[in-house]
Regions:
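Short, polar/acidic, helix-capping and beta-turn segments at strand->helix junctions
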Residues: 1-213
Length: 213
């Protein structure tokens, strides 16, 4: 693993890059982009991060394709619409938005996972597919629903995901590597998430006698 740190002072942005290459045709990158000037407006910070990210794709990371992006916002309710408008225009991978303010007081940070020599596309069911050689990976992000409580929401989310996997000849037990759940007001809502998750897992042969995700 190789680690790099770059400062783009003209854009008030710092970038951390972790790269892995074992000499085969596919290299992997995790990059974190974060503003350094808290006094800039959210729009200015978003534009600066986008400009730096695009410059990386045409420079140091040329040939790499994004498979997953996660934005960390200080105020998702008021900032998400502008971000989604821009992200939809450049939609090239699974996208996740989380309200988790950067520690340095700025309003937005971005984590991106990229690979080289992959072909990616969005599937009709909403998953993103990345293919290299004989391998296929499926990514999803920003799934949510407005069911009455956290239990119902979790059950619907997982059942929808099970169906998405089935359409690709996959199962939750055999092919899902990792899930992320972001829960508002954990003290109140987490119990419902756990209840629904465990109940769905049983139907998918994910038990103490097999394995969990």
């Amino acid at each position: 693993m190789k680690y790099q740190h770059h400062s783009f002072n003209n854009k008030e942005v710092e970038v951390q890059i972790a790269s892995f290459s074992n000499g085969n045709e596919v290299s992997e990158y995790h990059i974190i982009l974060q503003g350094t000037q808290p006094t800039l407006t959210y729009k200015e910070q978003l534009n600066n991060l986008t400009d730096v990210y695009n410059s990386l794709l045409t420079g140091e990371l040329k040939g790499a394709s994004a498979l997953f992006k996660r934005y960390f916002l200080s105020d998702a309710a008021n900032q998400g619409e502008m971000l989604l408008a821009m992200a939809t225009e450049y939609s090239d991978c699974a996208l996740s938005i989380v309200e988790q303010p950067p520690l340095n007081g700025t309003k937005i940070a971005l984590w991106v996972y990229l690979q080289t020599n992959v072909q990616s596309r969005v599937l009709p069911n909403g998953l993103f597919e990345a293919v290299h050689g004989n391998y296929r990976h499926f990514w999803g992000g920003s799934a949510f629903n407005r069911a009455a409580n956290s239990e119902y929401q979790t059950r619907l989310l997982l059942n929808d995901y099970v169906m998405q996997l089935m359409e690709q000849g996959c199962t939750l037990a055999d092919h899902c590597i990792r899930t992320w759940f972001f829960v508002q007001n954990v003290d109140v809502n987490y119990a419902g998430v756990v209840k629904a998750r465990n109940e769905v897992f049983v139907t998918q042969n994910l038990t103490e006698h097999t394995h969990y995700i």
